[in-house]
Each structure stands twice: as C-alpha cells, then as structure tokens.
C-alpha cells in the first residue's frame, strides 16, 4: 500500500505562500493557526533557502509516542491524524514534534491550550464521513475524493510535493541527478529516516 509523504525542495521554493494560503482557504483554518508555514533560512543573505513546513506525517511520529490519551494515530497509508474529541491540550505533541506542527488555538488563564490542530494531509478526521461537523473540526477530506493535498497542488514551482513516497523519492532522485547535488529535500531524513533505512 502507498505510504503518503511530503517533500519540500528548497532549491525550487520561491516563498510565494501559495501553499499556506491554499491550506487556510480550503479548510477554513481559524485565525492564529497555520497548518503550513514558510520559513526562510539565511534571510537576506546570499544562498538563502525557503522551505514550506507542516506536519510531515513521520514514519515513526514522536507525537504519537508522547500523547497520553492516544488522540494521535497513523492511518494505514501513513497519514498522521488526531481526534479532537480525545485531545486534552497537554502540549506534549508540540514539544515532541521536530517540525513544530501541532498548534493550540486557545489559551486560558489556567494554562489550558484547547484542542490541538495540525495538518491533516487533507484527509479530514477520524470519522471521514464528510459531515459539516467533521469539516469544521478538520477541514475538507480531499484524500477521500482521490485528490492530493491542496498545498502541493497549488505549488507553481513543484517545490512542495505530496503523494506516494516511492514516486516522490523518484522525482527527487531525478532532480538531484539533473542538478548534480542534493540537500534541497528539507525534512526528508528527519521524518522518514526509519523507513528509508529499512528499505
């Protein structure tokens, strides 16, 4: 079965923010929450690189391991999802994530963070019934419609790729061979190291 992955090629990203805008608009993401964001490394310096960051849906996701109520889980195709009805807002997932993907929209005077929100790889939530309630919690389920995440579809330079991990890695190998060097695949080894090593 396909193992869904993201890849951001820093050599191609032009920091246009199409991916972040597409995500916010597609899923009606609340103010203050960014399921996907752009980061520029070495901003204003020669050789600066921009990367699009979100949940990378890691092979061995540390957020799953630290969640005390098991609200974070991985689907059979490798997408890391969460159940907002189970989330207690402890924030352990935020501290465990190397990409800073889990976010908490509300904070109170007593330290409660509210329910965690993060990229769902456009796969909706645990019910996947397409209901209005499901949409309000998790956004649109494009995967059930046979589509890829909108952030990757909207990337005009194809810096952000999403889909079957074998296909994505083949595309990146071809780009690397054409360029003569790699290193533009930000987050790939951090998120998918265990599966790449074992194959």
Predicted regions and their residues:
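Non-ligating segments of multi-cofactor redox enzymes
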Residues: 1-199
């Amino acid at each position: 079965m396909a193992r869904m992955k993201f890849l951001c090629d820093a050599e191609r990203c032009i920091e246009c923010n199409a991916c972040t805008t597409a995500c916010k608009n597609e899923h009606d993401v609340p103010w203050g929450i960014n399921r996907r964001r752009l980061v520029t490394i070495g901003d204003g310096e020669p050789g600066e690189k921009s990367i699009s960051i979100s949940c990378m849906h890691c092979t061995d996701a540390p957020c799953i391991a630290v969640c005390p109520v098991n609200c974070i889980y991985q689907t059979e195709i490798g997408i890391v999802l969460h159940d907002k009805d189970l989330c207690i807002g402890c924030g352990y997932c935020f501290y465990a994530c190397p990409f800073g993907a889990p976010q908490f929209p509300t904070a109170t005077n007593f330290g409660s963070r509210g329910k965690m929100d993060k990229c769902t790889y456009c796969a909706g939530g645990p019910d996947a019934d397409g209901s209005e309630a499901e949409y309000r919690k998790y956004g649109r389920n494009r995967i059930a419609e046979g589509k890829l995440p909108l952030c990757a579809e909207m990337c005009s330079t194809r810096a952000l790729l999403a889909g079957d991990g074998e296909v994505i890695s083949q595309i990146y190998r071809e780009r690397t061979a054409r360029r003569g060097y790699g290193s533009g695949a930000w987050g790939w080894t951090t998120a998918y190291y265990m599966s790449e090593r074992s194959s």
